């Protein structure tokens, strides 16, 4: 069987790969595994460094955002604290004014009568002084009541009413004008004290 054609070899893909591997080994000799290990180590280091750089960059972005959020929150809290301090100062000044006015009214109400003092503080509004005109007592707050006493006697009567009430109760008396009779009365909502002046 003589054939003029060249023989056909049937080699598989695996056989070709094996042949290539053998040829590489013969060319490179024993250096091939060391070179492969060295390249592997270099790539592994580069991957670790790249991953660390990316992670650090992400952390830095997150930290800067967190710092900015904290800075904004702190500035808002400082504004709130300043506002609360202003409100507290206003409240304290209001309380001090109210307390001073109350003290002044109490001093006027409980003042010892002397010959020169003819003024009596209005028991209803406790701000203005009463005026005596033709048997009636008038205040600028709008009240008017009739009483047979003069200014000094009325002041003594008011002080006696307050003192007798304070023996039984710690609350302040309320004075009012009864519309039908036009007389001055006092009462306490706490102890049910009620009396005419």
Swiss-Prot record:
Region (Disordered), start-end ranges: 1-20
GO biological process, one term: protein import into nucleus
UniProt source species: Drosophila melanogaster (Fruit fly)
Zinc finger (RIP-type): 122-191
GO molecular function, one term: zinc ion binding
Cellular component terms per the entry's GO annotation: nucleus
Keyword vocabulary terms for this entry: Metal-binding, Zinc, Zinc-finger
Protein encoded by which gene: Ripalpha
Protein name: RIP-like protein
A Pfam entry, by short name: RPA_interact_C
Annotated transmembrane regions: none
């Amino acid at each position: 069987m003589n054939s003029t054609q060249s023989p056909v070899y049937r080699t598989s893909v695996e056989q070709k790969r094996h042949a290539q591997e053998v040829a590489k080994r013969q060319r490179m000799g024993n250096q091939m595994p060391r070179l492969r290990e060295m390249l592997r180590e270099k790539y592994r280091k580069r991957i670790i460094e790249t991953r660390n750089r990316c992670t650090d960059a992400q952390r830095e972005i997150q930290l800067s955002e967190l710092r900015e959020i904290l800075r904004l929150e702190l500035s808002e809290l400082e504004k709130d604290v300043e506002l609360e301090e202003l409100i507290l100062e206003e409240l304290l000044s209001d309380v001090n004014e109210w307390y001073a006015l109350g003290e002044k009214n109490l001093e006027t109400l409980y003042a010892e009568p002397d010959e020169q003092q003819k003024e009596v503080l209005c028991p209803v509004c406790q701000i203005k002084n009463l005026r005596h005109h033709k048997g009636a007592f008038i205040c600028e707050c709008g009240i008017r009541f009739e009483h047979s006493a003069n200014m000094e006697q009325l002041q003594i009567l008011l002080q006696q009413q307050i003192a007798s009430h304070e023996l039984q109760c710690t609350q302040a008396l309320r004075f009012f004008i009864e519309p039908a009779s036009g007389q001055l009365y006092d009462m306490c909502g706490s102890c049910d004290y009620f009396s005419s002046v």
